[in-house]
Amino acid sequence: MLKMRLLLTWVLLVLPLVNALKCANNRVLRKYHIDKHSAKKSVARDTPPSKTTEKWYVNPCEEHPADDIYDGCDKSDDICGIVMVDLPVFNKDPFVIKRIEATDMASFTATEESNALVLRYTGISWGQNMVAANIRYFCDKNSNEDEITSSIWANNDISIIIKGPSGCKKDSSELEDGDVEESSGLSWFTWLFIYAIFFTVVYLVVTSYTQTRGGSIDDFRHDFVERAKQFFTSLPAFVREVVSKVLGSAPNAAERGGYSAV
């Protein structure tokens, strides 16, 4: 059992970490003023014998400080929703019956519609459920702040509509030629490299665990280290062989391409 815990720990250590969303590096979001604003909404309604309060906070960009966040939310949250119930007859503090948070650990996409900027989060964990959230930003040039005009939480789908400056595109003079064209996160090549290393480590760990199942932790560690050394020592030769075969085939291909029927 202890060795299994060690295996799981090592696997988790190589999982890629995800930073907060930097909107200036997203080819869609960088064209909008979304990095300068957050939006919040608090609505209370009578639900006799109780009073229910629903709060929403939306701040997808790390560039904008989360100074105005609600209690109970985290500053790393892109979206935070809280539903509280107050029972005055019991003279108790309100208690939370619903709470959900979306961070950049969730899958994120940003798209442009004809008159709206759309942010979609999928894979948001809420207990044992997976929730999706759609946020639509509409431009209001007459407003200085974003306003949540609609929020619906039905089953496992959240829909939020925001009107304000965040939905307005920047002027061409505000856009820089050096803006990063790639979407937020790492490039596909970097992710490919990360996952190659990840699955290699998993393979080595599982193989060592299988070979030393009846042994001690020291046996497992020794076997893993030896296998890792052997793998990384032979890796350069393997890469050179692959490169030489690829480059070696190029002249032949060029030579074949040089002949033509007369």
Curated annotation (Swiss-Prot):
InterPro entries: Autophagy-rel_prot_27, MRH_dom. The lineage of its organism: Eukaryota, Fungi, Dikarya, Ascomycota, Saccharomycotina. Pfam families: ATG27. Regulates the cytoplasm to vacuole transport (Cvt) vesicle formation. Residues 21-170 form the MRH domain. The gene is ATG27. It is found in: Cytoplasmic vesicle membrane; Golgi apparatus membrane; Mitochondrion membrane. The keyword Transcription regulation does not apply. This is Autophagy-related protein 27. The chain crosses the membrane at residues 186-206. It is a single-pass type I membrane protein; Single-pass membrane protein. Residues 1-20 form the signal peptide. Its main location: membrane. Disulfide bonds join 23-61, 73-80, 139-168. One of its GO terms (cellular component) is mitochondrial membrane. GO terms for molecular function: phosphatidylinositol-3-phosphate binding. Residues 21-185 are lumenal. PROSITE patterns: MRH. One of its GO terms (biological process) is vesicle organization. Keywords: Autophagy, Cytoplasmic vesicle, Disulfide bond, Golgi apparatus, Membrane, Mitochondrion, Protein transport, Signal, Transmembrane, Transmembrane helix, Transport. Residues 207-262 are cytoplasmic. Belongs to the ATG27 family.
